[in-house]
Amino acid sequence: FVKAMDLSSEKSRAEFFAALSSRGEKVKMLINVAGADIQKAFEEYTQEKLLFQCRANFEGAAAMCLYAVQHAAKKAKIINISSVSGIYPMPYFAVYSATKGALTSFSLSLSREVKKRGITVTAILPGAMPTREDVRKQIREQKAWGKLAAEPPSVVARKSLRAAEKGKRKVIVGFWNKLMNAATKLLPLSLKMKFIEKRWSKISKDAF
């Protein structure tokens, strides 16, 4: 069973859910991996682009989770691909970091709610993943920093499945990303945001 769907569209999701329901099957595993990594100053957004990114990164994933928990098989597993970018505020990447932060928080909350039913919810926080060519180019331009923070999609997929099998609630992918997360906890928020602003204010991308 294969059916294309626009995760940011409520109508498209409804059609997808109807198609699934007609088959009468229970959800054994859900992996939410779709997202929009638009990166630019917030004032440069349009209302349409803002809603699209929020829906693609959070609303769509939450809607999929709702269907999954309402039609879950025993010991069902849900994997939500979030991002290390959602751990702290990111100027010039504000909407992306906010939506990924929301997805992480939602995943952790949901994992507690459905634990008694034997359903596992795991939030995966990778760094950059070299998927589209513009992303690969950006990683190359960041040189050593980009290479250290990036993980191939195959590695993220393998670690995500392993984490779900172990019943973990949240996993940061990559030694460098784990190290940076631990180190930045020692820094004041103003300093972290100043550093992030300096790096990301020079970059603007919108492949959507």
Per-region residue spans from a language model:
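Residue(s) in the substrate-gating loop at a strand-loop-helix junction
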Residues: 83
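Active-site loop immediately N-terminal to the catalytic Tyr-X3-Lys motif
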Residues: 43, 90-94
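Active-site-adjacent segment of SDR/Rossmann-fold oxidoreductases
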Residues: 71-72, 88, 109-120
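Conserved NAD(P)H cofactor-binding loop of Rossmann-fold oxidoreductase domains
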Residues: 33-38
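Active-site helix of classical SDR
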Residues: 65, 99
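SDR active-site lid
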Residues: 116-175
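Substrate-binding pocket helix/loop in short-chain dehydrogenase/reductase
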Residues: 41-54
